[in-house]
Amino acid sequence: MKNEIKYLYSDLDGTIVSWNPKTEFVYQNKSYKNFHEVSDATISAFYRLQQKGIKVGIVTGRDYCRVLWLEKQLRTGLPTITLDGAIIFYQNEILSQTYLDDRFIEGINNIVKRFPEAAYKLNSGWISYFTKNPSVIFEIDYAFLGYFNPNTKLQKKFIDSTENWDLNKLKVNQVYFDIDTCPLAMQKEIIELISVSDVNAKIYEHSMYIIKNGVSKASALQSLNQFAIPITKDNTIVCGDGDNDIEMMQWAKHSVSLIGSNPKCFALAKYHTDSVDNDGIANWIEKNLLC
């Protein structure tokens, strides 16, 4: 197996980044959990893989503001796939991006005008458009933008929920709602709009995010061939734990999941390892790719 592998792509949260980090960082006099915390064992394993000639990349549902610093820490050499495949970044440029249809964004615009208290963001390339409404989720985004990315192309801008958006200028890769700020009537309208639109939505306890239908981590990995990166399902191993990793587990010949993962993701993976808090991925790499 190890002689086949030329590329390794790993998810972040729950895979190599713990949901319970041990460290914090301080931004504007407030402490935040450091979801950039990666163990020394993982950093070492990734570095030694690359020394061996196996290239390493990140594939995540995160916004790039929560990834860019990790690229440097892990010294990745492949394009970074963000927003579950909606944007691919490489060498400080956008390599590829997929937009939601203008008609869908117009529908979202009409809904938020009726519920101006809701907190959400529109991800658009290097720019994240936020409302000014209070949100625990987006407050953390502000902190990550300000603390880890002060001198990058990443930008934070604010959008007015009461205005008609200029869809000739506003091209959106992802819509992300803080569900805790959205009235039930609003949530119902959003779900109804989703049901008649060409979109893919992930709905969790506190959040909902929406990207173009057909876009996934797997589709993004497959698209890298058009950029002269000869990734195939046979020469790539993927690591993941969540429901948004299922399609890439189905695509790749070689896949690793961890104890504590989404049950379907875990069942689909070819190989299994210990939990993220016990350095599962690093240990698996040591035993199977660096031996």
Swiss-Prot record:
Magnesium keyword on record: yes
Top-level taxon of the source organism: Bacteria
InterPro entries: Cof, HAD-like_sf, HAD-SF_hydro_IIB, HAD_sf
EC number: 3.1.3.-
Active site: 11 (nucleophile)
SUPFAM superfamilies in alphabetical order: HAD-like
Keyword check for Hydrolase: yes
Cofactor(s) annotated in UniProt: Mg(2+)
Binding site for Mg(2+): 11, 13, 241
Sequence similarity: Belongs to the HAD-like hydrolase superfamily. Cof family.
PANTHER family: HAD SUPERFAMILY HYDROLASE-LIKE, TYPE 3, PHOSPHOSERINE PHOSPHATASE
Protein name: Putative phosphatase MG263
The organism of origin for this protein: Mycoplasma genitalium (strain ATCC 33530 / DSM 19775 / NCTC 10195 / G37) (Mycoplasmoides genitalium)
